[in-house]
């Protein structure tokens, strides 16, 4: 509920903002909440968090430590469990929030119902951030999201590609805010390169191709494994390292065994220190079929890693083909292998791309993106009652 306004149209206290998300695992959208909590203007925003899935808690403690209060689990059995909707309604009603900022189209469907069930004068403004291209979502999710989206909502997209993929009624009012990274802070991890390579058992003359991505179908791991088989056959001294966990872990390990990759491909599981692991890489690879604006890719650029990535979503907004890395078509393991072999055998080209990568990362400023989101909060909070 927007309180009494001061002369400039803003409340006389920090805005009470509730971030609503499916879970607090280690995915990109979840990492953005941590980033916003870290760099927020505490005089403007007092954030709270509500998340659906009790099994997804990796980042809950970090958000609490950064001042998000409360961090509430809605204890849903799944995203489609309707019982979380009245629970969210109670959280919003009791917290008297000014803004509800939703970070998933599926979650947005129920969150809108929770907000609209409140008395009109008690309804917070709604902001929805679209983190992935529209086609990556299930048809039923797309239908229900479009059906429930309100004209008074504010929509943010993490990349131009995401915005362009949205249905017309949403696309025409969506704003692009590309998030960023703290490149200087990330680069401090490079001092641990030798130590981390030692832990992974990597020889000095071995080239490491690494990735950081959840083990889900959209991340293209089966393609990467097929490509890895060809790269190892053609180059010999190349190792693959993958950090991440997810529902496909057993299937991917079985595929790795069938391909005979042995110790040439290592699944590390979830690593809280994933950026430190990345410091051991020589090439960063992302084989995704869908992406919005991958945070791991931005972290790789900050570390000065040349990139081989699929040209999907907002990837091309970060990588110019032939400059910071090489772009290939999705679901084409032969193209992926060719690009990886080319870079693995050409250290001078990798070094040149590393310089471009660092320069590109310097333009991706995390505090700037947080300020842009908070400017949106200020704008919608200063507007007197609109249609909700």
Regions found by a protein language model. Give the residues of each.
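N-terminal strand-loop element at the rim of the active site
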Residues: 3, 9-15, 19-83, 247
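Aromatic "clamp/platform" in nucleotide-sugar-dependent glycosyltransferases that forms part
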Residues: 270, 289
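Conserved acidic donor-binding segment of nucleotide-sugar-dependent glycosyltransferases
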Residues: 321-322, 326-333, 342-348, 362
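Short hydrophobic beta-strand element within catalytic cores of glycosyltransferases
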Residues: 306-309, 319
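A conserved mid-protein helix/loop that constitutes part of the nucleotide-sugar donor-binding site
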Residues: 27-35, 207, 211-230, 240, ...
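A short helix/loop element that forms part of the nucleotide-sugar donor recognition site in Leloir-type
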Residues: 3, 187-202, 257, 386
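Short His-centered aromatic/hydrophobic patch
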Residues: 102-108, 130
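Carbohydrate-associated surface elements
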Residues: 161, 180
């Amino acid at each position: 509920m927007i309180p009494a306004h001061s002369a400039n149209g803003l409340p006389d206290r920090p805005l009470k903002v509730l971030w609503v998300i499916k879970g607090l695992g280690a995915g990109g959208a979840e990492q953005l909440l941590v980033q916003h909590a870290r760099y927020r203007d505490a005089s403007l925003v007092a954030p709270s968090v509500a998340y659906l899935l009790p099994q997804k808690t990796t980042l809950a403690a970090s958000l609490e430590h950064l001042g998000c209060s409360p961090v509430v689990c809605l204890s849903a059995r799944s995203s489609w469990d309707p019982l979380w909707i009245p629970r969210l309604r109670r959280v919003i009603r009791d917290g008297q929030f000014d803004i509800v900022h939703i970070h998933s189209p599926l979650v947005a469907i129920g969150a809108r119902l929770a907000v609209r069930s409140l008395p009109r004068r008690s309804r917070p403004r709604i902001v929805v951030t679209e983190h992935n291209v529209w086609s990556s979502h299930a048809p039923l999710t797309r239908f229900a999201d479009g059906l429930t989206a309100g004209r008074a909502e504010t929509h943010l997209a993490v990349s131009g590609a995401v915005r362009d993929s949205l249905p017309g009624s949403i696309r025409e009012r969506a704003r692009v805010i590309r998030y960023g990274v703290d490149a200087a802070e990330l680069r401090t991890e490079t001092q641990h390169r030798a130590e981390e390579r030692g832990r992974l058992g990597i020889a000095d003359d071995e080239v490491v191709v690494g990735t950081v991505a959840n083990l889900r179908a959209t991340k293209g791991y089966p393609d990467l494994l097929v490509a890895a088989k060809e790269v190892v056959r053609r180059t010999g001294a190349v190792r693959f390292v993958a950090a991440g966990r997810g529902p496909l872990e057993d299937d991917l390990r079985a595929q790795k065994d069938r391909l005979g990759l042995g110790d040439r491909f290592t699944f590390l599981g979830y690593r809280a220190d994933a950026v430190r692991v990345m410091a051991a890489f020589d090439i960063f690879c992302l084989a995704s079929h869908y992406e919005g604006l991958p945070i791991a890719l931005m972290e790789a650029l900050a570390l000065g890693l040349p990139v081989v990535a699929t040209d999907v979503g907002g990837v091309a907004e970060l990588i110019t083909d032939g400059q910071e890395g090489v772009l290939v078509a999705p679901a084409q393991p032969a193209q992926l292998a060719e690009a990886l072999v080319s870079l693995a055998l050409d250290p001078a080209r990798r070094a040149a791309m590393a310089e471009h990568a660092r320069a590109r990362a310097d333009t991706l400023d995390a505090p700037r993106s947080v300020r842009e989101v908070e400017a949106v909060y200020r704008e919608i909070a200063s507007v007197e009652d609109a249609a909700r």
